[in-house]
């Protein structure tokens, strides 16, 4: 369960970056020759991506290849901007790469993930948020944790919010009610 979430995120990031990948790669080549501090390089690459993250690898999930896939995938993830890399560190993604590689499943997982169209044109940010929430909920249930510790379903949030903002304004304005 914990493996699917970071791979889903990886694929979503890749799909989102697809539109500006060529611009980022061109800018990365320019920036590499300038001798700028890492922070300045990152700002220029973020500007080229037009997003709050980027990836400077010429690879993508479809180009990793079966031979050396663990090293290639690790290199690909390390080519993301600092904030995106930190997310994968919190997922302990490197450990999952090693575990899947040890049992010869890494290439198969990558091949399955890369076929999913998680582009913004296919799945809106709102819908993608719902996908992530559902994955988190399912994995919390699967690990015998209480799902409510990690997840509050949207219908419960809507119900609670509607109760708080009900039309009965007079009831809420009387002294001693709240």
Model-derived features: positions:
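Conserved class I S-adenosyl-L-methionine
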Residues: 170-178
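Non-catalytic, mostly N-terminal accessory regions of nucleic-acid modification and defense proteins
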Residues: 1-169
